[in-house]
Amino acid sequence: MSYARITAMSGDVPIVSHLYFPSFLDDNIPNERMTGIAMGLELMDMCDEVYVFGFDITEGMKFELDHAKETRKPVRLYDTDFNPVNVKTIPVDERADARYKGIIRNLKVLK
């Protein structure tokens, strides 16, 4: 089951810009890709919180999480099975590598 579906079935409204924008923007055209990224940040600004699933964070996700950090947007962390990740145990969580730990540092993480 997709993360968007799980989120929707949990009663929240998922905004998945990386699935929506490629339906009318070409990711291979740099200007259109940057337009999509900028619009994604605008959508994020309208959201109440951001969900992060899994420990593999792409460069695009990192860019979005940096924006969430700058704007103090609340973030929820989940593993790939939709289990909440406890921010207090991340230093000893073997699933979280140093890059992940660095990216989520100073995020406004919700429990």
Where are these regions (language model features)?
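Conserved catalytic or regulatory cores that recognize and/or transform ribose-phosphate-containing ligands
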Residues: 1-111
